[in-house]
Regions:
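Outer-membrane beta-barrel "beta-signal"
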Residues: 33, 37, 106, 136-138, ...
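Glycine- and aromatic-enriched membrane insertion/assembly motifs of diderm outer-membrane
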Residues: 40-99
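Strand-connecting loop/turn motifs
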Residues: 27-31, 62-66, 100-104, 134-139, ...
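Transmembrane beta-strands of outer-membrane beta-barrel pores
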Residues: 38-44, 53, 73-79, 100-102, ...
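Transmembrane beta-barrel domains of outer membrane proteins
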Residues: 58-60, 97-99, 131-135, 164-166
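Residues that define the transmembrane beta-barrel architecture of outer-membrane proteins
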Residues: 28-32, 49-53, 86-92, 122-128, ...
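Bacterial Sec-dependent N-terminal signal peptides
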Residues: 1-24
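Short glycine/proline- and aromatic-enriched beta-strand/turn motifs that initiate or cap beta-hairpins
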Residues: 18-61, 166-170
Length: 170
């Protein structure tokens, strides 16, 4: 069921790209975002992990001054507590952002697949990551809730903050 949902979400993004026949990438409409995240595990993940740190990598295309889409990836490392091992999530997702103004509030989210590392008998599952934050030309600071609905009824959830720097294409 999760894989079917993922396919539906990916196909829903395809009409946006199909309608743009003369897409031109410029420093004003496309860039890379690279940054760090820090969070606290919630739900079942809080039983086996005390906190997490991660990398956030994104490629963004701005359709107009308010709407952006792109590809998101990175790595979230969960530090095990007590006798539990560390583990991680590597997302591969599409993302959407709505910017209210050129500098200020934004909201958005990622939807894709989260690959799990160092967890036996579980490859991963549906990955969602809604966000709300502040942005300017160079920086994004945001709060997020991240959930990977993995196989065998394992949900890996955390809440946290992140910061990314915009690397413009020239």
């Amino acid at each position: 069921m999760n894989k079917l949902f993922l396919v539906i979400v990916i196909l829903s993004f395809s009409p946006m790209f199909a309608q743009q026949t003369d897409v031109e990438f410029t420093p004003n409409n496309s860039w890379l975002k690279a940054g760090l995240t820090a969070g606290i595990p919630v739900g079942d993940a809080s039983d086996v992990s005390s906190f997490n740190l991660g990398l956030d990598l994104r490629g963004q295309y701005l359709f107009n001054p308010n709407i952006a889409v792109g590809i998101a990836s990175g790595y979230s490392h969960f530090f095990g507590k007590d006798n539990f091992d560390d583990f991680g999530v590597v997302p591969l997702a599409g993302f959407f952002r709505y910017y209210f103004t050129p500098n200020g509030l934004f909201f958005g989210g990622d939807v894709g697949y989260g690959f799990l590392t160092n967890i036996d008998n579980n490859q991963g599952g549906l990955y969602v990551n809604p966000q709300i934050g502040y942005h300017n030309r160079d920086w994004n600071i945001y709060a997020f809730y991240q959930n990977t609905f993995a196989e065998n009824d394992v949900d890996i959830q955390n809440v946290g903050v992140g910061v990314t720097y915009n690397i413009r294409f020239k």
